């Protein structure tokens, strides 16, 4: 069996994208997905994304973590699949698509892709961190000297010991100025730090506004893989009209024989 794939990246968060409108990809083959995502034995990626037909909107996004299991919403992956759908001539410059957490709008904006995220109404504020769900669960914690912080060790500990078997993504944040923050994220399912996390950047932007670290509702996030921006409105304790914006690029195409 030959599987044609497209390798994408959005601020260093990289994905294998596959056109599965004919439903030929073996989605229950966890080992295959894990091997394709392996950086030593496969293509190498933080996750694998299938584009499938939808009965109600332009297309459906099915996301797998690099461990082969179905994942929750992926913001950078969502931006990449919008680019992929345009590449396949399914859409022009805007779209509505279906994902595991509901429907999302996507737009091309000056070679960037802006993705509308779902509303956020529940934020758990603790002494040292915040917890919220932006399509995926996120722990947000401020630290000093983020550049030298041991994200892998502390992230793995919190992911496994604080959040149990289901786990959570863990974000560490350092403020740069009034509306700019540096972010590093340990992602569950990848079980490592990634160069960027879109739902994590979204969670950080909302968390910083909630903590009154910023009064801006258009926030810049600097990740190891590049820059993202998040804008939103807060109405009656609910964060709405949340948009994640950043680049999405096709790196190469190829065929996988299995």
Which role does the model predict for each range below?
Residues 115-128, 153-158:
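Active-site glycine-rich loop that binds ribose-phosphate moieties when present
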